[in-house]
């Protein structure tokens, strides 16, 4: 058996974006996930995988069955899946964790094969306008969760 050592990074897929072929976009992304090699150790989803994701306590957006099935198959193979919130999918609460993903809300430094990487979506890096900071803080309030 070959040793697992591959790590993949994906961001800004924007599933659900109104494009000419949204179902095709979802299918291509699910196919990409399904074709990750057996040596894959980790997958980092670095935000904005969905163009708009708003999750309630007991309700999640409909659709994306192919993508969730592909992610579940990866996790069943032992691939660790990390999900960073982006500015389009900031309204995630516990669903991804229930599926087995590790949810990250802030940039972090990770070590991969002896090298350190700073990972995150990036929307909060650099100068951030007050209005954006205010909205992000507002959406994080338990009352709005």
Residue ranges and their predicted role:
Residues 122-145:
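Active-site-proximal loop/helix segment associated with metal-binding centers of metalloenzymes
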């Amino acid at each position: 058996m070959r040793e697992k050592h591959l790590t993949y990074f994906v961001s800004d897929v924007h599933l659900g974006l109104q494009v000419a072929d949204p179902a095709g976009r979802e299918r291509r992304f699910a196919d990409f996930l399904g074709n990750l090699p057996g040596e894959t150790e980790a997958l980092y989803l670095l935000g904005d995988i969905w163009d708009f994701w708003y999750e309630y306590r007991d309700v999640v957006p409909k659709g994306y069955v192919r993508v969730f099935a592909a992610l579940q198959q990866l996790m069943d193979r032992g691939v660790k899946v990390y999900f960073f919130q982006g500015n389009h999918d900031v309204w995630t609460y516990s669903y991804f964790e229930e599926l087995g993903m590790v949810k990250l809300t802030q940039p972090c430094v990770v070590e991969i094969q002896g090298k350190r990487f700073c990972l995150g979506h990036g929307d909060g890096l650099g100068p951030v306008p007050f209005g954006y900071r205010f909205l992000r803080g507002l959406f994080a309030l338990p009352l709005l969760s």
